[in-house]
Amino acid sequence: MTNKALLVVSFGTSYKETREKNIEHIEKILARKFPDRKFFHAYTSGMILKKLRERDHIIIPNVKEAMEDIVKEGFTDLLVQPTHIMNGVENDLMKADVLSFREHFSSLSFGAPLLTDTSDLFYVIDALTKELPALSEQEALVFMGHGSTHYANMLYGALDYAFKQTGHPHVYVGTVEAYPDLDAVLSLMEGKGYRHVYLAPLMLVAGDHASNDLAGEDEDSWKSIFQSRGYEATCILKGLGEYESICELYVRHALQAQPV
């Protein structure tokens, strides 16, 4: 029996279809990449775990519960790969939970979240622009990130800048819960002559934020706000976990995991 384990940690989603297309998709790819490690997974969102348990009778462990199982089964070599987008609050809390079990492992390594250094920005830009529609001068593509009060939130502005630096002037990045917000994006787009806007989530899953805050029919959704300003709006409800090239970056981070 191997003494090696792989723990894949996600924020989670209560949407079955997008869970299968994104989180479980990445989990399967990572599990296949590390056949010498027993696979474990965990979600960090207590609200989502509670909803899955009570509504769907699906039991997924949180990080501490998964770690207890890993220790109980006697594994001493652990690789942890998060599917988080950035090194934000969720990733910090996840690492703290894992490290509280450090004494049980002879080897413990963490892979990086999706966007960790500058090379990740350019990799993701290349991956997404190959997958998404080519834009005319009258078309724009707007990504909705989650956003955070954590200092790592600055990566969204860096990503927007990097899109433009790499020859994609009609691509914009905003967030639903922080800065740059939709108002900031709209101000940058003003006077550019755009008629048609593509809207896409910059999130692992196309879940609640994508379905409601981005593409919902309420007047305060991004789609509705763009339409109210005279733009034609098309929503691309596809989580990042559906893109094979994005999954490959998570694999790369896992292969380059840093020991602690």
Language-model segments: which ranges?
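Active-site-proximal alpha-helix that buttresses catalytic centers in soluble enzyme cores
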Residues: 1-260
